[in-house]
Amino acid sequence: MNQDYLHATLGRTGRPVFRLGLSASYRPGRETVFRAVDEGVNYFFAYGFDSQMVRALREVMKTKREEIVLATGAYNWILSYTSPRKSLERRLRQFRTEYLDVLMFLGVMKPKELPLHVLDEMVKLREEGKARWIGISTHDRKFAGQLAREGILDVLMIRYNAAHRGAETDIFPHLTAHNPGIVSYTSTRWTRLLSRPKGWPADQPVPTAGMAYRFVLNNPAVGVVLTAPRSLAEFNENIAAVRKGAPSDEEMAFMRRFGDAVYGRKEWFM
């Protein structure tokens, strides 16, 4: 992967990306999307219900479509048939664009939830040019590693943070052959990495969200880490933090210790 700390090529897509990507799932306001664009962010992940991002990106893409990497897609409903084609067509209408950059199949919890008909349909959409690249989001690290070895998918959206570091052994070593782009999410472990866990010494600090993102970005296997701020102020804090650059060895060691303490609580989190 060709990259510096804030810029990378997203795996075999060949697409240059700013390494902090934006999700608007927590409705931070349209102005946050516009500010992100101004700050150089170009990877945007959206669900179909992200109306703020939909409206903002419609406006941005009128003049900057080729600068934007739009990742969205179909939901894994598990108990019912999912059509990536129908989902793609809905997203094209929503965003008023002729193609998606990354068509995702979202929320794959186990291998059987990525049936062959879904994968075949996604490949066909890529061949047709309606999606430039295809990928999935999953928390199943072993399955993600398998998919990386097989080389069908262009992008893998995975969990990787200071508390959940298993991707370092289960996924990242398998990227070399086919070079899928890696997008990381849940960097704060649903904010648990920002709160003092039971037993953590009272005189010891607690990480900020920015520290959590910098921990993830320090791994060169990661192309993009997603931030999902709740406000423009949070976004400003997060991007200012990552612009500080790579964490020191001491900061990395601290994040691992804190991550171990959070993981040790054995709470169930996606």
Locations of the language-model features?
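N-terminal binding-site loop/beta-alpha segment at the start of enzyme catalytic domains
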Residues: 1-68
